[in-house]
């Protein structure tokens, strides 16, 4: 690969620009060996409109290899079955923002962004873009794939920073977005596994007298979409015995959504400045509200056949659901030492 960049700043430093160009290639297949097919230009601009006011924007084209598990997948004959199906994944992104700054003590900014994804690997078996397979799938990519899926994500972010020297350090951000994928150009967009819709973060530290300080972090994220199980198919004895786990109902892919999750962390520090060193003690309380992050229930077979008198291909297991959630108060006591 090759990479180059050039930067410019005006004499009064009100305008800055950066240009870059990257090219990638490899010898995995004939479709990936040409540098000219994976040229990635990018540009970043910033301009001071007036006192305290700044506008900035950037645009770029990026290429990335599919997962190595996909590139290295072989069939029973030892053939790299994805060799002629996969291409570099292509991502183009643009953003534009405006900010108001008062020195280094206060800043408010608003930024909008748009990302377009192309040549994303698609699972031939499941008919799902590889990037949409969430944490439930374990290792992904070791299957037959084709680079036909597309995606997009877009949204806006508000960022606030406030600093009072030796007293307060506060930062907050709120992002709203949508993340969608489709199998090909003719398909409709559907929510990706990461389409949480919003993320909120607030963190701050306040310095008290006598070298005490208190910090807090508040995090909140919208619920992720998920695909419900096909209970009828999953309960079939022949189907369950074939793979030992439930089947998803892909006709309702990512149509359901989990609850939102919020967490509050608290930290208290006490510092002692000695002659040649600094000694500190802290109490860190993560998730002080003991909030629970809920996941999709697991559909399991009880091993009991509900209709043993039925023909073998029509017998069904009695099923049960196991709740999945995590989250507990996690206290930590610590010591810091600097010499």
Q: What is the role of each PLM region?
A:
Residues 11-13, 48-52, 91, 101-105, ...:
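Outer-membrane beta-barrel channels and translocator barrels
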């Amino acid at each position: 690969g090759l990479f180059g960049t050039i930067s410019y700043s005006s004499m009064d430093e009100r305008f800055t620009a950066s240009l870059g160009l990257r090219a990638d290639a490899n010898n995995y297949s004939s479709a990936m060996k040409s540098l000219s097919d994976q040229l990635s230009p990018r540009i970043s601009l910033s301009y001071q409109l007036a006192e305290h006011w700044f506008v900035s924007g950037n645009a770029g084209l990026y290429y990335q290899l599919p997962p190595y598990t996909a590139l290295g997948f072989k069939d029973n004959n030892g053939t790299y079955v994805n060799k002629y199906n996969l291409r570099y994944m292509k991502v183009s992104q643009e953003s534009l923002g405006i900010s108001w700054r008062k020195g280094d003590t206060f800043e408010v900014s608003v930024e909008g962004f748009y990302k377009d994804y192309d040549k994303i690997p698609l699972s031939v078996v499941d008919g799902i873009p590889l990037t949409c397979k969430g944490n439930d799938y374990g290792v992904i990519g070791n299957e037959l794939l084709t680079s036909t899926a597309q995606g997009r994500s877009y949204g806006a972010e508000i960022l606030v920073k406030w600093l009072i020297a030796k007293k307060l350090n506060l930062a907050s951000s709120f992002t709203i977005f949508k993340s969608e994928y489709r199998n090909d150009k003719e398909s409709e967009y559907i929510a990706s596994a990461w389409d949480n819709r919003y993320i909120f973060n607030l963190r701050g530290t306040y310095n008290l007298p006598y070298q005490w300080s208190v910090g807090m972090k508040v995090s909140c994220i919208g619920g992720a979409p998920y695909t419900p199980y096909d209970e009828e198919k999953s309960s079939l004895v022949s189907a369950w015995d074939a793979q030992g786990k439930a089947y998803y109902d892909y006709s309702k892919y990512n149509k359901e959504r989990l609850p939102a999750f919020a967490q509050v962390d608290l930290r208290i520090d006490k510092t002692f400045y000695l002659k040649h060193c600094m000694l500190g003690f802290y109490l860190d309380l993560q998730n002080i509200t003991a909030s629970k992050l809920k996941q999709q229930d697991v559909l399991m077979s009880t091993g009991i056949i509900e209709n043993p008198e039925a023909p073998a291909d029509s017998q069904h297991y009695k099923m049960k659901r196991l709740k999945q959630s995590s989250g507990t108060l996690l206290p930590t006591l610590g010591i810091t030492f600097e010499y």
